[in-house]
Amino acid sequence: MRTGETKNYYIWDKAKATDPAWTKPFPKFGKTLTTIDPMSQVMCMTGLFGPVGKGWRFKNTYTYTDQNVFAEVIIQWKDNDTWYGYGPISSVCALYKKNGSLDDEAPKKATTDALTKGFSYLGLNADVFLGMFDNNKYISEMKTKFSTNGSAESNVKIIDPAKLRKDKDDK
């Protein structure tokens, strides 16, 4: 069964397409993977459900060991005045940098990673997670799609990052 063939994909289909402007390649495990800007995911959730705290929210807890911090995230969203959710989704991050100093951003990094994984279960950036960003033709299609109407197949209004950078540089 493909997306769009049943009403069960109503969130997935709105959130599956990724604007390439919010991605970047990074090397890992001997190949190049695609990473997604986490704030673009927050923007997408806001476009889908409304402001954080009102239309969607997350709850997180941390567990610390001598070397690591574990973040557990529960994601919730409102649909027709009913809250839905799932989780916890977990992630772990080292508390110390390679030079031995404390990484004071470790909890934030673990939370961000858990949110990204959790958002993927709703369908956010599904094209990246399904490996479609390994295909240059697909990326070109997404660039065209997002440059044409700003929101691809979705009802989510995506802000053009190039325009944001230009506006910021003009100030």
Residue ranges of each PLM-predicted region?
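Interfaces that engage single-stranded nucleic acids at replication/repair/recombination sites
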Residues: 1-6, 139-171
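Positively charged, aromatic-enriched nucleic acid-contacting surfaces
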Residues: 29, 36-145
